Amino acid sequence: MKITLSKRIGLLAFLLPCALALSTTVHAETNKLVIESGDSAQSRQHAAMEKEQWNDTRNLRRKVNKRTEKEWDKADAAFDNRDKCEQSANINAYWEPNTLRCLDRRTGRVITP
């Protein structure tokens, strides 16, 4: 595919005016300056959507935090109950780690130390 010099010059002669015509249309001059306050309908709608999403996730975050706090309180109470059970004057009291309860060795019933 040899392109002769005359074909290259002809192609260049054709493409150069086309490129110049396109470049002049691209660089149009304007004398107007548009200043937006940032308070457009689109930005208000976007802010409303973000607020709605935040509120939805806030409810979910509250549920997760309550569950975490509840589990923490349960573990904390079990730790305190274990200490009370182990320090109990009742010699038949023992701590059951699987159920997190203080049980009587003879009956297997829950006791309060």
From Swiss-Prot:
Disulfide bonds: none
Alphabetical UniProt keywords: Signal
Signal sequence interval, chain numbering: 1-28
NCBIfam families membership: PRK13659.1 (NF010180)
Protein family according to the UniProt entry: Belongs to the UPF0482 family.
HAMAP family named among the record's database cross-references: UPF0482
UniProt-recorded name of the protein: UPF0482 protein YnfB
Organism: Shigella dysenteriae serotype 1 (strain Sd197)
Lineage, broadest ranks: Bacteria, Pseudomonadati, Pseudomonadota, Gammaproteobacteria, Enterobacterales
Gene name in the database record: ynfB
